[in-house]
Amino acid sequence: MAKLEDFIKAKEKLSKVLLETHLIYSPIFSKESGNKVFIKPENLQKTGSFKIRGAYNKISNLTDAEKKRGVIASSAGNQAQGVAYGAKESGIKAVIVMPKSTPLIKVESTKQYGAEVILHGDVYDDAYKKAKELEEKEGYVFVHPFNDEDVLDGQGTIALEILEELPETDIILVPIGGGGLISGIACAAKILKPEIKIIGVEPEGAASAYEAIKENKVVELKEANTIADGTAVKKIGDLNFEYIKKYVDEIITVSDYELMEAFLLLVEKHKIIAENSGILSVAATKKIKEKNKKVVSVISGGNIDVLMISSMINKGLIRRDRIFNFSVNIPDKPGELAKVVDLIAELGANVVKLEHNQFKNLSRFKDVELQVTVETNGSEHIKNLVQAFEEKGYEIIKIKSKVN
């Protein structure tokens, strides 16, 4: 098990490459959770995630002989950039094996840090096997993304920074993928402040740590199904399992829909864009039982595909009842469509989409179906809108307010 001096040494080494990520107080997540919530924005690191901490600490602890051999890693995202940047800053060779399906932007970002990129296989497991083959064949040093003591020590420096800036922290919420981040943070935090509570957060569709604790052994999930792809890990590290058992107080899960809602609030209220895995801890603030505590949520990364941003925002708006989809039957005669639009306008809602389908068969042959999407101010606004339609004699026949 790691000792305090291991984390302190790691912090000293990392001072050369880290951006100091100060805590950000969140009024919105504080209000919704009944606690004082602070955000630790690791998405602002140079490589876009916390991974540089563990990768650089691992590389800096290599012997001169090992550094001459160079390092190798397998990744489709944050680990690739962390290892590539860490190797560049240390002046050594880095080879990163990535699946062929890796988005071009991530491949190019990794290359920009000077790493040699090898595209191999269709999924991460294929890339991992190839990296291990090259480790054996070429003599590279493999940098594991989470199941490694030096990596764990690097990640744990986050806890040192949190407790230095906010010593009265009661709870730290940490995303869990393979388990390296929470292992380091939990160990360091408990050494410094034994009474602190550490809560791990996993996606519902990839809760490998939760299942491991429940079974009291490392288990492999049949599948990992979640939009939080960075934490879609079927099996946590065995080393990390021991740390989690000893230092983590609780593990909770959040749904993809809760992630969408948290994403929207981060963008709208904090102007922060983070990846789905990175916001697990923020999404979990509403699910903790404690009240009136000082809570720190670690945003672990911000490397999100730009094409996903609009989808996350739109689904978050639906989740918050800010977008309302419904269908209503109206008489098929001139002026009826205008009446509906005028009624919506009177109620202060904004039409986003309107589809007037005259050819859909209805039980009442003189009616047509009108499909409407409007922007609203929330649940109460929707309730008023539905009531107003009913008072005018319209029947809303299909309501799709939530995404769950």
Feature locations, PLM:
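PLP-dependent amino-acid enzyme catalytic core
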Residues: 1-404
